[in-house]
Amino acid sequence: DRQKQRIVIILGIILALLVISIPVYGWVTTFIMPPRVTIVRVNDTSYNMGYLLKMMRMVQRQSESEGQRVNLGTLPFQFVNDLATDELVLQGSQAIGIKVTKEELTERLHDEFLRDTEDTDRAATEADLLVEFRERYRQFLNQIQLTAEEYEEIATRTLYREKLEEHLGATIPDQLPQVHLFGLGVKTAEEAEEVRTKFARGTPFADLVAEYSVDPEAIRTDGEIDWVPRDVLDATIKDFIFDELVVGEISEPVPQFNSESNQEFYVLYHVAEREELRDVSEANFENLRSLAVTKWVTAQRELNDVTTSFDSNQYAWLAK
């Protein structure tokens, strides 16, 4: 009888432990484990779900304070990619001798939080400005719920990217071959053929833009895109525009897709002029410099140990 009682007691204890362990396991798997899961790793540096959640909340709070809404459907995936990119930029920049000093970081923070005091308070002393900076910085950190160290890591990565852009931008020539490009977007392939027929019969391109364009801004500018170097254009059209489209002619319609309206439309391009060497505009230079960084990062991904892991289950945890 005593042996049977012991067996019953032991079974009761085991059953009780099982009953207790189920909610404990659920609590651990729901609240303890997910924040520690690594989602980005670049060589020896890693970021986990907890960090991603903190960054997302920061952006949400900033956006809410500015009266804007955040697209939570795409934001986490973009953050994961950006974390990997920013870490590659930081490590790669340091590897080629680029540095961000404490003084540069301090100057950037002061510029950010004292920007509106430059013209309105010229009589303020350095001590006054320091007090104002500290108070504004404190309020900002409280709003986004980050520590000073956490926010300064973000600002440091931004500075590294800017310095890398400057470094790579030094290799971009001041002058490049360019075309004076115009574009006309129309609703259907039939309209595109009408445009081509009328252009062949002598109708000016600007008149065709005014009659057929689906873009009001294009009508205002007569369809002018800009003087552009090759690499500023989308990879799907740049070689065609530069190597095949004759000056003064109009292109075949190029199918495009508008993700906002979920509709297909067609674009016809027109090169009015071409110059073998032309000064690169500031806007085009910025585009080329950004493209240079993108290409550099792509190459760095092949040279470094980079892992990203973010799936639907992790997204569901973030969305809770």
Regions from the language model: what does each represent?
Residues V131, E135-G183, E211-D215, A235-E282:
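Proteostasis/folding factors centered on peptidyl-prolyl cis-trans isomerases
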Residues V70-L75, Q178, E224-D226, L277:
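Surface-exposed aromatic
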Residues D1-T74, E302-K320:
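Short, low-structural-confidence N-terminal segments
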